Amino acid sequence: MLCLLLLLCGLASLGGPLKKYVENSGMQITVPEKIRSVKRGSVESEVSYKIVIENTTYIVNLVRKMFLPHDFQVYSYDSAGIMKPFEDYSQNFCYYQGHIEGFPTSLASISTCAGLRGLLQFETVSYGIEPLKSSIGFEHVIYPVKHDNEKSQYLKKSINVKNVVYKIKSIKSSVRTHYIEMHIIVEKNLYKHMGGNTATVTEKIFQLVGLMNAFFSTLNLTVILASLELWIDENKIPTTGDVNELLHAFQKWKKSYLVLRPHDVAFLLVYRESPSYIGAIFQGMICNTSYGGGIALHSKTITLDSFGVILVQLLSVSMGIAYDNADLCRCRGAICLMSPEAVFSSGMKMFSNCSVKAFKLFTSSQVSQCLQNQPYLEPVYRSNPVCGNNRVEQGEDCDCGSQEECQDTCCDAATCRLKSTSRCAQGPCCNQCEFKTKGEVCRESTDECDLPEYCNGSSGACQEDLYVINGHRCANEEWICMNGRCLSGKAQVQETFGTEMEMGSVDCFEQLNTKNDITGNCGILSPGNYKACGASNWKCGKLICSYDKSEILRNKEGMTIYANISGHICVSIEYPPGHAKSALMWVRDGTVCGPSEVCRQQQCVSSSYLGYDCTPATCSDHGVCNNKRHCHCNPTYVPPNCETQDSTKPGGSVDSGNLRYEPIPETYFVEGAYHTKSRKWPFFLIIPFFVIFSVLVATVVKVYYQKKKWKTEDYANDENIESESEPKSSKVSSK
């Protein structure tokens, strides 16, 4: 059962009047003085400043903190609703964190991109610093960050203790660095509240992430801002109403539309005048692709410092870190980060001993695997692309190195633009500077649950990697698809133990996994303390194979464990806590464990949580649904619903790019005065003109003689009429 955490905030502090955090009476003008600089290449890796605060000089020691990937992008939508990246915002060399010398519990989070901007936290008071506008010198404004928190408190936290998977127990410390790759979305109203300017809003989000990293430094955890999305003109989903419903709507939306660079967790930041809640999150689910997301509500009067604390608390809860029990938990700061009061307090805030233990326990389990992926980071300090560095950057079509070393016939090395005769320079759908034909395979299917992708005929890049929707049956209906793989228990056994291995017998699984020791279990509570599988969960515990060989299985990285059950040799593996392969010890999430049931975190649960709502019947029983819930049709059936059949169509989906290429009829252009070459008409084109001309001549001749005949007859008739009318005229006149 998921524990959905909804956090209520103090109405008196977020919903009512709050003192402005910059008070005129506390403002000071200071001129920071750089006294130390350590460079690596052309970038300062360490720097120290003297800063005067209230007539006292302090030394702030800073170390560069990288949290933007080298290909970071800020996205928004154009008037047609198509997502587009903004200009380069990937400058990531100028963000620092550190402390104030002589104050061991202090914290500093500073940006030096354009002057100093950020936060200085002493034990009981915090100061904001930012450049003084229109200053001739290096003058800055420094001010105390204050909160009217006399009445601030959480009215309740809906945490069901029974659903907190990880109990706090002692565990050895770890120096391993963990990473959270985060995608942040700023909705329309918050975008306006933060300044209504892309550069301003982006800088504030950078400040937030920098502050979060300063808080998480004690856990050796880095938040990477994978990408930023701004909803400037309109929101993609309604952001009003109940925050619980908003979270579920956001999760549903991001499954279909959030297809940017890889990320572990996505957050929607929403502005509300006087919210009752500060956010919503799924507890302990940060690495779950279906539930790795959250909502954070920004009130009208909250400070950037407080909003950073809210995001840290929400992320912490998503990693299984509960709120502190004031009677049991302690920290070195004035107030602990996972205390409800931390949102509204000034001064240094640190994680408690309870939070540190909970985090270490979480990262020692297989459900924290996504935090172990180290993203590619390198200093990006050029605001403009550099042509000739062998890297395609913003504003470039291609980059093949210097003019001397470039061997790309499609790319102009001097401008990093395509040559006039080229349509593309690189990519699986580019061949000799031309796009490959629409429908040509550019990415083969790698699994029964994977789908092939095709060139679309208008780009050198391959289509997005698509796969069969999670929950679809595979391997003769025995297993199900999960993230493009058929989660076969037998395949996992062979991947883990060897290609000749077979899955353990029912007796192996049932008798071993109902124990609570190293041979079989349903999870590790703490080193040496194992959790026995319940009566319905033993198929989801330790992964076990049957072994009938005489030689010993060898595994240099883990411990191989043998057990004799009913005359069968049953084998499992034990990896040390935090090992990169520790997830292989247990049956994978999504493995079938019963009718309409699958394994999930060592429990056999209903498969309904997968949201398998797009079935072959949705596709008229002539296809399967892909991960975007669009039909991928069988050959000869036509997307989007696979209802109609056409023998000339190859099937596929509206996403895969393999709709058959329909050649455009050749267009004949009438040459104008600028073209002087003579035109040679083919003989077969002259014949129709000759026939038409002959018919016209014959028609004209016929009409001519017909008219002549009519005139002769008319003349004769006129004479007869005159002769007949004369007596009548005289007769009338005689009267």
From Swiss-Prot:
Keyword list (alphabetical) reads: Cell adhesion, Disulfide bond, EGF-like domain, Glycoprotein, Membrane, Phosphoprotein, Signal, Transmembrane, Transmembrane helix
Q: How does it sit in the membrane?
A: Single-pass type I membrane protein
Gene Ontology molecular functions: metalloendopeptidase activity
Carbohydrate-modified residues are 55, 220, 288, 353, 456, 564
For this chain, the Swiss-Prot or TrEMBL PTM comment says: The signal and the metalloprotease domain are cleaved during the epididymal maturation of the spermatozoa.
Q: Any chance you could tell me the propeptide residue ranges?
A: 16-176
Q: Region (Disordered): which ranges?
A: 716-735
SUPFAM superfamilies documented for this protein: Blood coagulation inhibitor (disintegrin), Metalloproteases ('zincins'), catalytic domain
Disulfide bond positions = 287-370, 329-354, 331-336, 442-455, 614-625, 619-631, 633-642
* One BP term from GO: male gonad development
Peptidase M12B domain location: 178-375
| Residue ranges that the Swiss-Prot or TrEMBL entry lists as coiled coil | none
Task: Tell me where in or outside the cell this protein is found.
Answer: Membrane
Q: Where is the EGF-like domain?
A: 610-643
Pfam families tied to this protein: ADAM_CR, Disintegrin, Pep_M12B_propep, Reprolysin
Q: Which PROSITE patterns match?
A: ADAM_MEPRO, DISINTEGRIN_1, DISINTEGRIN_2, EGF_3
Pull the Extracellular topological domain ranges from the record: 16-680
Phosphoserine is carried by which residues? 723
Q: Which GO terms describe its cellular component?
A: plasma membrane
The annotated subunit structure for this chain is:
Heterodimer with ADAM1/fertilin subunit alpha.
What does the protein in this record do?
Answer: Sperm surface membrane protein that may be involved in sperm-egg plasma membrane adhesion and fusion during fertilization. Could have a direct role in sperm-zona binding or migration of sperm from the uterus into the oviduct. Interactions with egg membrane could be mediated via binding between its disintegrin-like domain to one or more integrins receptors on the egg. This is a non catalytic metalloprotease-like protein.
> Can you name this protein?
Disintegrin and metalloproteinase domain-containing protein 2
Q: State the gene name recorded for this protein.
A: ADAM2
